[in-house]
Structures are given as C-alpha cells and as structure tokens.
Amino acid sequence: MQPTLSDSDQILVNTHIYDFSSPTTGDIVVFDPVQSKRKQAIKRVIGLPGEKITLRDGMLYVNGDIRKEPYLKGLPHYLGLDEFSCQLEINQYFLLGDNRSHSTDSRAFGPIMENQIAGKALLRYWPVKRAVYRIK
C-alpha cells in the first residue's frame, strides 16, 4: 500500500462500520484473503458489486469510464502490467494496492466477498511523525 501505508505503520481499524453500511470506492479495508497464508491484508476498494473493472493502456476504467486516482501521487500506476478485466457479481469487491506494480491484490486472487472484509482503516497513529487522522 505504499506510499499511503508502510509495513511498519500502526493503524486503527473500525471493525463495525460495515455492520451499518457497505464499503465504498476508495475505502482502505482490512480483509481475510482466502488464498493467502497471511491472516489479514490491507488494500483499497476499487470496484463495487455490479461494476466492470478494466486495466488497459496504463489506465483504470470502471464501467468504461477512466477512474481518477489522486492518491497514487504520480506513481507509475500500471507500467508493464498486462491488460485485465473483471465483472463483479453481487457482494463482490475489487481491491488494489496503491503500489500497483508490486502489489498482490484482486488481479492475482480475484474479487473478494463482502463477508471477507474485517473493517475500514481510519487513522495511522504510528510512527508519530506520519500520524494522520484520516487515511485517504
């Protein structure tokens, strides 16, 4: 998730927020990856149920429209990555890491189900010099 989050960052996660609402585009979520040996992982919600996600020519498209991603801060988004397309079903979400060229995300393990999402990352409290009230 670099540059947004680093491996050593400590974050506060709201584990009840999705009891009352569903994840939205741009949310940074902690989830339980079925195909991974890791207990939990953290990625950004890119696609919502019913949407079509396409990566083509270095750009992200959602339902055919280019998705602006200001949080990538000038990183090479998809340099050297293969084209990819995915139609999301009911209760499926498409997650990507912010460091797209070095991220294992829904391009590798596929969409995740809503019940795999454990919570939303709210704030980074450590290290103190990088503390932020709201992770974007």
Residue spans for each PLM region:
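Soluble "head" domains of membrane/secretory-pathway proteins
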Residues: 2-136
